[in-house]
Amino acid sequence: MVMDVDQKKSIIDVHAKHEGDTGSPEVQVALLTARIEQLTGHFKTHKKDFHSRTGLLKMVGQRRKLLKYLKAKDVQRYRALIEKLGLRK
């Protein structure tokens, strides 16, 4: 269930604004989205795993807050990220 180091590094490389960038909202949202997708697949087979579902809901809330922040700061970056990740907003 834990994200592979290579997966995480590739996601960071794609969304980073500069070398060593791990904290920008784009990188954080991309990592949360990958983790959310991973957990969604987990719940298809483990329907009664309510403890992990709580963690999933926290991740979704954190991603929503980061997207709200990014939208308030720079709408163009927000729209580009939404399109790149394929989120519904």
UniProtKB/Swiss-Prot annotation:
PROSITE patterns: RIBOSOMAL_S15
Taxonomy, superkingdom: Bacteria
Record's GO cellular component terms: cytosolic small ribosomal subunit
InterPro entries, A to Z: Ribosomal_uS15, Ribosomal_uS15_bac-type, uS15_NS1_RNA-bd_sf
Gene Ontology process terms (BP): translation
Family assignment from sequence similarity: Belongs to the universal ribosomal protein uS15 family.
HAMAP family: Ribosomal_uS15_B
Role summary: One of the primary rRNA binding proteins, it binds directly to 16S rRNA where it helps nucleate assembly of the platform of the 30S subunit by binding and bridging several RNA helices of the 16S rRNA. Forms an intersubunit bridge (bridge B4) with the 23S rRNA of the 50S subunit in the ribosome.
Quaternary structure annotation from Swiss-Prot or TrEMBL: Part of the 30S ribosomal subunit. Forms a bridge to the 50S subunit in the 70S ribosome, contacting the 23S rRNA.
Name recorded for this polypeptide: Small ribosomal subunit protein uS15
Source organism (scientific name): Nitratidesulfovibrio vulgaris (strain DSM 19637 / Miyazaki F) (Desulfovibrio vulgaris)
Taxonomic lineage of the native organism: Bacteria, Pseudomonadati, Thermodesulfobacteriota, Desulfovibrionia, Desulfovibrionales
